[in-house]
């Protein structure tokens, strides 16, 4: 280091001599030195600015390009190394320029022009990077919007798939319900058949019971006759027994008398011994007969008691059987009523399920249309997404091309810098040759020179003690890229990359042709039962149920309060002519009062019997049911027509008289032209009271449409098929009530 410093002082102390001219210490060289120093400072500043700008540009490019600009980072690092090498070369040139001649000013000016060109190129590069930054931001925004749309599309597709699965599950559930209902109907039909069979069996049993009752009655009557006969026989036996007792007493008296006679007539004992023995034998026979009679009497009494007990048992059994049959009949009637209600409920449920299935089919058709629309929209969105992805790929390719262009430009610029450096080295060598020809004079001592090069490595010293572990140093700059090695084996699949930047939205593509319908997927598992739905609209009027069995006659009710006195009745017909009376006294004949023949009085309100009056019209509410044409003919036979409802007041009045009853035909139809409803006289409909969603002409495509109108349970209008059976309402003008003639 000291030798280098001494050499620099010697160089600065000597002057130079050329063409016989020798300059002193105070000459133009000082001015040139100051200019050189100023130019060197400017070069340092420019190099520092250049390095700063290049570092900033490289940092921004690396920050914005992410994974796409990995090559840019390596190139930036190589360029930094080259620029540091350029700086070191420039420093060396600056050190050597202090020793060189004045001719370097022109070369410095050329170098300045080159640096200005580099600045312009760097400005262009910055502008391009800013533009690329804007395009990258746009691409990121477009990519984010595409990701959002894709997420929305996925959500909508998931929702649609969930809806389709739920609809399929509901359809499967309804199919299960329908199959269960069919099974229930088949079971009910079997139960009805079994009940009919059991009913026939019960009827047979009842007939058998009636026969057995008749037979029991006959047996009871026969038993009563036999009991009467036995009672008569017992009375006869009692009378015979009494006679026998009297005979026995008489015999005892005779024996006593005989004993007295024997005592008195011992002499006649021998003669009468045979008679006595005979009498004893007869008495013994009589005693045995009496004992047999008493046994027979006991047997007869026991038999009569057993017969009486059996009669009582038979009467109890008869009462029990009557009670049981009555209970069984009541149970059978209750069962029949329950079966009738069940059948009515089943029919209503079947009609409701049919209506519900119709609504389900309509809803499914709506869902199909919405699904097709959404699928077409999704296909359009997917095509647009594909187009945007293609555009993003093209943009990325263009960006890569621009990056390659920038790399090539930077390579050319670095090559130009290396060429400039080589030219500077050549100029320095020329300047050195020129300086050798100068005569060097001792000049004033110059400023302290820069730090010298590192000396040679000395011999290794003795190994010292192991020190503490130092702090981790900063990572060094990456080295230059080495030569490309041989292709290694295929590595394992890498992790999924980070989410790319969002591209710009591309133009909407043309709508593609609809694809072929895919195969029907397997039916899924039935889902959990959903929450109970809201109460639906009242279903259509069901078919009339079967006529129920006649109930038992109830007990008479409490007599109500006495009503108001009625209107005077119609005067009766004149009675038969009586016999002529006795002749009256002669005198002046008085004139008889003229008297009108009695006529049947009409209704007070001007309407026939069973007709009701409202304003100036009469209405007939039928109890029988007919189809539309038969109802119209019935009203025409009554010189009237089916009712025409032309005001709200008339509608409310008719509603009061039909609340709680079944449907009624009115004179409204669209049989002439579909959906053009007219009254039967051809007049248009001014007042309307249709139910919500009516008239719907249900049945088009499935059978005859609904072309006739009627009133339903709520007083609103509904369209029916004309061959259905309903009640009806007739209407005609009220007759004028004539004043009564006294």
From Swiss-Prot:
Residues 59-742 are extracellular. Residues 439-608 are annotated as: Disordered. It comes from Mus musculus. Ca(2+) 1 binds at residues 644, 646, 650, 731. Residues 73-142, 205-254 form a coiled coil. One of its GO terms (molecular function) is carbohydrate binding. InterPro entries: C-type_lectin-like (IPR001304), C-type_lectin-like/link_sf (IPR016186), C-type_lectin/snaclec_domain (IPR050111), C-type_lectin_CS (IPR018378), CD209-like_CTLD (IPR033989), Collagen (IPR008160), CTDL_fold (IPR016187). Scavenger receptor that displays several functions associated with host defense. Promotes binding and phagocytosis of Gram-positive, Gram-negative bacteria and yeast. Also binds to sialyl Lewis X or a trisaccharide and asialo-orosomucoid (ASOR). Mediates the recognition, internalization and degradation of oxidatively modified low density lipoprotein (oxLDL) by vascular endothelial cells. Binds to several carbohydrates including Gal-type ligands, D-galactose, L- and D-fucose, GalNAc, T and Tn antigens in a calcium-dependent manner and internalizes specifically GalNAc in nurse-like cells. Residues 614-731 form the C-type lectin domain. It is found in: Membrane. Expressed in vascular endothelial cells in the heart, in perivascular macrophage and smooth muscle cells. Expressed in plaques-surrounding reactive astrocytes located in cerebral cortex and hippocampus and in leptomeningeal vessels showing characteristics of cerebral amyloid angiopathy (CAA) in a double transgenic mouse model of Alzheimer disease (at protein level). Strongly expressed in lung. Moderately expressed in heart, skeletal muscle, spleen, liver, brain, colon, testis, stomach and kidney. Expressed in neonatal astrocytes. Residues 501-514, 534-556 have a biased composition (Low complexity). It is a single-pass type II membrane protein. Residues 1-37 are cytoplasmic. A carbohydrate binds at residues 691, 694, 696, 706, 718-719. The extracellular domain forms a stable trimer. The extracellular domain interacts with fibrillar amyloid-beta peptide. One of its GO terms (biological process) is plasma membrane raft organization. Keywords: Calcium, Coiled coil, Collagen, Disulfide bond, Glycoprotein, Lectin, Membrane, Metal-binding, Receptor, Repeat, Signal-anchor, Transmembrane, Transmembrane helix. Residues 516-532, 571-585 have a biased composition (Pro residues). This is Collectin-12. One of its GO terms (cellular component) is collagen-containing extracellular matrix. Ca(2+) 2 binds at residues 670, 674, 697, 706-707. Glycans are attached at residues 67, 159, 168, 271. Induction: Up-regulated in activated microglia and by fibrillar amyloid-beta peptide in activated astrocytes. SMART domains: CLECT.
């Amino acid at each position: 280091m000291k030798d280098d410093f001494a050499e620099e002082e010697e160089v600065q102390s000597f002057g130079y001599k050329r063409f016989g001219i020798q300059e002193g210490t105070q000459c133009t060289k000082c001015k040139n030195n100051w200019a050189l120093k100023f130019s060197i400072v400017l070069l340092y500043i420019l190099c520092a600015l250049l390095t700063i700008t290049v570092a900033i540009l490289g940092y921004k490019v690396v920050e914005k390009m992410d994974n796409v600009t990995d090559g840019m980072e390596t190139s930036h690092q190589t360029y930094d190394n080259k620029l540091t090498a350029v700086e070191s070369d420039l420093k060396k040139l600056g050190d050597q320029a202090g020793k060189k001649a004045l001719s370097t000013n022109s070369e410095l000016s050329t170098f300045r022009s080159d640096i200005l060109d580099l600045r312009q190129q760097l400005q262009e590069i910055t502008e391009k990077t800013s533009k690329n930054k804007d395009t990258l931001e746009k691409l990121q925004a477009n990519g984010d919007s595409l990701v959002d749309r894709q997420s929305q599309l996925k959500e909508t597709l998931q929702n649609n798939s969930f809806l389709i699965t739920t609809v399929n599950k509901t359809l499967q559930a309804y199919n299960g319900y329908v199959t269960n209902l069919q099974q229930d109907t088949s079971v009910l039909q079997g139960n009805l058949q079994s009940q009919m069979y059991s009913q026939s069996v019960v009827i047979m049993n009842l007939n058998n019971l009636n026969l057995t009752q008749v037979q029991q009655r006959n047996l009871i009557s026969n038993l009563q006759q036999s009991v009467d006969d036995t009672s008569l026989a017992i009375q006869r036996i009692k009378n015979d027994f009494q006679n026998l007792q009297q005979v026995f007493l008489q015999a005892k008296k005779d024996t006593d008398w005989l004993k007295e006679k024997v005592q008195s007539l011992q002499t006649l004992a021998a003669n009468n011994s045979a008679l006595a023995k005979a009498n004893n034998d007869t008495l013994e026979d009589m005693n045995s007969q009496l004992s047999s009679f008493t046994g027979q009497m006991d047997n007869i009494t026991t038999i009569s008691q057993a017969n009486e007990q059996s009669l009582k048992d038979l009467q109890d059994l008869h009462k029990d059987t009557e009670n049981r049959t009555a209970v069984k009949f009541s149970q059978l009637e209750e069962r029949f009523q329950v079966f009738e209600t069940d059948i009515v409920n089943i029919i209503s449920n079947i009609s409701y399920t049919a209506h519900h299935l119709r609504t389900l089919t309509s809803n499914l058709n709506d869902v199909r249309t919405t699904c097709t629309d959404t699928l077409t929209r999704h296909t359009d969105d997917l095509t647009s997404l594909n187009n945007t992805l293609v555009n993003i790929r093209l943009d990325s390719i263009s960006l890569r091309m621009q990056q390659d262009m920038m790399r090539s430009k930077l390579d050319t610029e670095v090559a130009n810098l290396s060429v400039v450096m080589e030219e500077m080295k050549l100029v320095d060598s020329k300047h050195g040759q020129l300086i050798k020809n100068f005569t060097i004079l001792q000049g004033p001592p110059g400023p302290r020179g820069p730090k010298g090069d590192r000396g040679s490595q000395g011999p290794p010293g003795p190994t010292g003690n192991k020190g503490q572990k130092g702090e981790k140093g900063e990572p060094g700059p990456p080295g230059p890229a080495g030569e490309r090695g041989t292709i290694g084996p295929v590595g394992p699949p890498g992790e999924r990359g980070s989410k790319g930047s969002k591209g710009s939205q591309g133009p909407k593509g043309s709508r593609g042709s609809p694809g072929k319908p895919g195969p029907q997927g397997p039916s899924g598992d039935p889902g959990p039962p959903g929450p109970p739905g809201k109460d639906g609209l009242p279903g259509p009027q069901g078919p009339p149920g079967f006529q129920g069995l006649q109930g038992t006659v109830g007990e008479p009710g409490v007599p109500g309060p006495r009503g108001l006195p009625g209107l005077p009745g119609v005067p009766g017909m004149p009675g038969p002519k009586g016999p002529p009376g006795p002749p009256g006294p002669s005198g002046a004949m008085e004139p008889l009062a003229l008297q009108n023949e009695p006529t049947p009085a009409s209704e007070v309100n001007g309407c026939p019997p069973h007709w009701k009056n409202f304003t100036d019209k009469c209405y007939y509410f039928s109890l029988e049911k007919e189809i539309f044409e038969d109802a119209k003919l019935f009203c025409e036979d009554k010189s009237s027509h089916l009712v025409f409802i032309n005001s709200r007041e008339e509608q409310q009045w008719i509603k009061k008289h039909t609340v709680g009853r079944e449907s009624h035909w009115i004179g409204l139809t669209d049989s002439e032209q579909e959906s053009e409803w007219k009254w039967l006289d051809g007049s248009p409909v001014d007042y309307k009271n249709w139910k919500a969603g009516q008239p719907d002409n249900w049945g088009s495509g499935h059978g005859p449409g609904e072309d006739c109108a009627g009133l339903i349970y709520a007083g609103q209008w509904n369209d029916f098929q004309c061959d259905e059976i309903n009640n009806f309402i007739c209407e005609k003008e009220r007759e004028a009530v004539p004043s009564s003639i006294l």
